[in-house]
Amino acid sequence: MSARLAVVGGGVVGSIIAWRAARNGWRTTLHAPDITGAGTSVAGGMLGCAGEGRPGEDALLEFALAARDRWPALLADLDASGVDTADIMVAADTLLIAADSSDVGHLRAVVDHLAAFDVRPESVDRDRMRSAAAMLGSSARRGYLVTGEGAVDNRALLAAVRSGARSAGVTLETEKVCRIGDLDADQVVVATGSWAPDLIEGVSVTAEKGEILRLSRPPTAPPPPDAVVRARWRGRSVYVVPRRDGVVVGATQYETGDRDDTAPRVGGVSDLLIDATELMPGLAEYRVAEIGSGLRPTTADGLPLVGRRDRRTVVAVGHGRNGILTAPLTAEIVVDLLDVSSPPSASPWVARLDPRRSA
């Protein structure tokens, strides 16, 4: 009889783990009280490393680059499972933009830093910028194109992975898990993000709140950009990610001491609207379809906590703003760790992401 696995947490990280484990022979139950996937449902879905290449976060950039390389195989596996993936990819490239002289200096520093990791965004003129994003306003002073760093529709992705999981035999349970000791399973994976400390003592994650906007395009408005647009705009960061019916605009980010405080903050929404419509004036013609907010679980060093806590429990939390990007590599590591009878994993990330480093 197959060994029993309980995956607690139904976002994209937990769902991909459940799907991969079931394909590896585990009798898997996915415990997802929030059927929408909580943080996954309010994400931009960017698969970009260049936009995350901040000096001082080298290890996080290395992890993001390693994770990015897993995406073609993930999409191919979904296709091979009979899952329709046509609506998942929404952009293939990323355009990095700066507004004033301070923003240009910041962007140049990021681009120079990326060269050490063999990531070399291409400097583009205004015509090339507008080719990728026709709505760009005249205030955009500098641009770099990152070919091959696109984005997915986060909600379409989660639906596809859940469909693949069901086809692989995963059982979905929506009742909230309060104690992992009560689960009828040989192995347990905890992928509950900011709520992990409720289930496992000593898991150190901090909840950061962020708002996003979903804007729908009326027939008379300009079309969405072809690429992801990530801007340093008058000292703030803003991104615009295309969707087939509009765009996602994001995202604010700040610490919150109250995990129940998930309502969008007026100031954050106002900042996003101002920055997005200055960046792309044509967005003023779009309609506000949704204002969302969610919690991102972060760690002290920026790297997620992925690994064993004991012989029965594996944790996969703390992915911060990179949960979707890094989910395939996280799942690969976790599924490898689940087989306690096999030799230790050769992946260098097993040691670097060890959750005991935060204890």
Language-model region placement:
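N-terminal Rossmann-like FAD-binding beta1-loop-alpha1 element of flavoenzymes
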Residues: 3-29
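Short hydrophobic core segments
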Residues: 6-8, 183-195, 331
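Active-site substrate-recognition segment that forms the wall
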Residues: 16-23, 46, 85-88, 194-311
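C-terminal catalytic lobe of FAD-dependent flavoproteins
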Residues: 282, 286-359
